[in-house]
């Protein structure tokens, strides 16, 4: 039974104003959670909250810059003050970054991608974990990618960051497994989000062709796996990396 499995629990979702993050926030709210919609774009976060409130959910818009530890700390504090003890977190905020080979990759672009996609996950867990422990335990899902275990030419920073997320997830899970906190990572394939909707048709077709399922993923499919990992149905699952990729990694 999944209908209201998160009733009474507070969840913080970063990058939650659109795409996968919004799908996760919507699913958790629909199953009873109080959700902090955390995003760099406060106006977009407020729009998402309005949509959640329209379906009867309790939600809070929180502005956060995951590259700034002080901003992340403040976002976690605001969440707890506004919605109550934190027991669930989804660290989803991320960017794609520039496309270039390693030998020609701009160091500033490298730092920008790592700061968001890897440092941001560390900062998020750094400030979420004390609150989750104080709440008596809970679960975290970090959004990695199929590129968390595979290479992809032209995306060295993104691939390195997403590999790092998988490693960080495993280490953190070991540290907190005996304290009632589970930590897992999700590895989506290419998902039909706003980031890809404006892609060149040929490039989009090439991405679709990478998936034996013959299509891009849907944000709701990633949200479904994420919600499962956060739930008590996954009570013996921690420290692992879970694919939702239409067969991409099976090739």
Which residue stretches match the model-derived regions?
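Short C-terminal tail/terminal secondary-structure segment
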Residues: 2, 96-99, 150, 210, ...
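Alpha-helical segment proximal to the catalytic Tyr-Lys
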Residues: 130, 174-178, 235
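Canonical Rossmann dinucleotide-binding motif of NAD(H)/NADP(H)-dependent dehydrogenases/reductases
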Residues: 4-36
